[in-house]
């Protein structure tokens, strides 16, 4: 399918850097031995700085902030992460971004966010495929990466827009939580 997709539409891809990501959601942001509240109900700038420090120390390129991050501290966190050579990817519902993706992406870019993890497409039709293309194209305009989660199956769009780092379109290990 990859070779059947349209060739890359981006003139400059030098900014696209795949890599590992720290991610608080997998273990519900529970940290032991810290002197601040942790857990999914206690997400804070302090907690995310801890993760950024850990990612930096372990040469992990990204920190993915899943559901619950706040615009109240995202700009400060992105500045902090940049000093530590860690890039921030933020999670969002597809419905939050699809109404006007350019505005949402511009806002995230202004905060210093490096990418978006877009979730809950909740369909596998041409409309969802169009959303994916639109997200990838608009993110690329701001030199931001995309991670598609709960999305349609990959169809080669990452050839056209190589800023798509990952498709999480399978029923994977996270289903063990339910």
Residues covered by each model-derived region:
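Conserved structural scaffold segments of CAZyme catalytic domains across common CAZy folds
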Residues: 1-83
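Aromatic- and carboxylate-enriched substrate-binding clefts and catalytic-loop regions
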Residues: 67-178
